[in-house]
Amino acid sequence: MTLLRIDGSYGEGGGQIIRTALSLAALTGTAVRLENIRARRRKPGLAAQHLTAVKAVALLCDARIGGAELGSQTLEFIPGRPVRAGDYTLDVGEAREGGSAGAVMLVLQTVLPPLALAEGASTVSLRGGTHVPMSPPFDYVREVWLPTLARMGVRAELSLVRSGWYPVGKGEVRLVVAGGRRSLEALKARHRGTLQAVTGRALAANLPAHIPERMAARARAVLADAGIAAAIEPAVLQAACAGAGLFLTARYDHCLAGFTALGRRGKSAERVAEEACGALLAHHRSGAALDQHLADQIVLPAALCREESLFSVERITPHLTTNAWVVDRFGLARVDVRLAECGTGLVRIHGNPAGVCHAHP
């Protein structure tokens, strides 16, 4: 059997290569071999959330896997059948003794595209870190990523059972995916239109109520100075450990954009607010439609469209170009990423009129 070889050290060289390759392998029935996984990282190889993603996608398509263990830099993934809808429970903590704050949102973004094209509805419970560094938080996925996918025909609902913060995790979310799609609808977002509203949530877990209130107040003040009114709700959550963060959503005529800042010991509530607001204002001034994170997260779904997707992005990042490279390696769609004169990017994803072609045995 010939396996498609994917160099895990290419470009950004992180976990996104693993996740995108797994999703596309399951969707197309392509057997893959990932090598040099996270080779340039301080702790190379598969981490807990990567291993959970491997096992989760393998469960969806009855894949045979080799090298699925913590720290492994080589992985073989051979799908056994088309993706099957069902009820699944995935625990990032199972991959490491004592639990993990591994990012469950990244695992969710790995399993959702295959389930969206499965024959029936699915329910997925995911346990681990819901608001952790280096990953989109629950609020971003629910308020920005999923609504953007809804424009592309994906019907899914996400709810928070309990929040999980770094370093303990132990949060839980529930995802319901309708399934039944043969392909997705192309995303057209070259121009974003007028800013309609900015909303947000200032959250703190196991911390005094004044912390989210201070984050919300400072964020409203910073945005007001820039001429933007914002409706930001402070809230205190229960969790297994303390945590705090501010999550902002900018709603334009034709798109959404999201911005996050997390707290940590020694970082003031006001600084958290200023960080999130700074990201929002930088995006707003760029004139682009998609924020830099949404752009790389939408490449894979756009590759599942029959028609061409086109969108502008605030900034071209290594995550974006690396994800485009992985999609190109599968031959499912061609991705063009170009730098515009103003420093923003323009992404064109040429759809596949034949749709997703399965090569399962």
Curated annotation (Swiss-Prot):
Q: Which of UniProt's keywords are assigned here?
A: ATP-binding, Cytoplasm, Ligase, Nucleotide-binding
Amino-acid positions noted as binding ATP in the UniProt annotation, renumbered to this chain: 109, 293-297
Q: Does Cell inner membrane count among this protein's keywords?
A: no
What broad class of enzyme is this? ligase
- The catalytic activity of this protein is classed by the Enzyme Commission as 6.5.1.4
Q: Cross-referenced Pfam families, in alphabetical order?
A: RTC (PF01137), RTC_insert (PF05189)
Q: Which GO terms describe its cellular component?
A: cytoplasm
Annotated catalysed reactions: a 3'-end 3'-phospho-ribonucleotide-RNA + ATP = a 3'-end 2',3'-cyclophospho-ribonucleotide-RNA + AMP + diphosphate
One GO molecular function term of this record is: ATP binding
For the biological process aspect of GO, one term held by this record is: RNA processing
Question: Where does it localize?
Answer: Cytoplasm
Highest taxon in the source lineage: Bacteria
Residues the record marks as active site: 319 (tele-amp-histidine intermediate)
Protein family membership = Belongs to the RNA 3'-terminal cyclase family. Type 1 subfamily.
* Record NCBIfam families: PRK04204.1-2, RNA_3prim_cycl
Read off the PANTHER family from this record: RNA 3' TERMINAL PHOSPHATE CYCLASE, RNA 3'-TERMINAL PHOSPHATE CYCLASE
Q: Which HAMAP family match?
A: RTC
Function in brief? Catalyzes the conversion of 3'-phosphate to a 2',3'-cyclic phosphodiester at the end of RNA. The mechanism of action of the enzyme occurs in 3 steps: (A) adenylation of the enzyme by ATP; (B) transfer of adenylate to an RNA-N3'P to produce RNA-N3'PP5'A; (C) and attack of the adjacent 2'-hydroxyl on the 3'-phosphorus in the diester linkage to produce the cyclic end product. The biological role of this enzyme is unknown but it is likely to function in some aspects of cellular RNA processing.
Q: What is this protein called?
A: RNA 3'-terminal phosphate cyclase
